[in-house]
Amino acid sequence: MDEREARALLSFAEEARRKLAGPDAGVWRDRLERRHQELEAAFGWLLGHGHTGDAQRMAGLLAEFLRLTGQAATGRVWLDRALAAAMVDDRLKAVALYENGTLASWQGADEEACSLHGRSLHLARRLGDKPTIALALCGLARVVLREDLEWARALGEEALRTVDATDD
């Protein structure tokens, strides 16, 4: 693995993330499955060579795929490793915390999911990053929905108000 290969695989992961939400999702899941070992090697190379932001981006881009294919534990390991590395981009960190919280929730680790989403929300609010604020609020809402419908509704409504206030 070298930098050129790692960056090409990061670009592939970016394209795959977009395509997983479209009509060719099954085709792209298969492509990701076939290249999983290469993607894991690229993630390790990026992290090991100080490209922590790119490693976090890759882990975040692949989190949904890993969740959908029953590999949430792998996604959490990748995100934990990226979060443990020194990150200079707080926005990427806020997104990584959200993604990790989502995977924790899927694993039934509700307390950890709430903590991760809460940390994401705190950081996103500090940055004024409205899209990530809305994501973190939705993540919290999904977790607390199991226990407190009114609180989940309030979080969801706040997320909607936040999204309405963005240009995205």
Language model region names:
Residues 2, 6, 26-100:
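Short, well-ordered secondary-structure microsegments
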Residues 1-4, 8-12, 19, 23:
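Short secondary-structure boundary elements
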Residues 19, 56-69, 92-109, 122, ...:
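Tandem amphipathic alpha-helical repeat scaffolds
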Residues 46, 66, 86, 120, ...:
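Eukaryotic all-alpha helical interaction scaffolds
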Residues 8-11, 41, 48, 61, ...:
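The canonical alpha-helical register within tetratricopeptide repeats
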Residues 5, 39-42, 75, 79-82, ...:
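Tetratricopeptide repeat
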Residues 28, 35, 48, 68, ...:
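Alpha-helix C-terminal capping/termination sites
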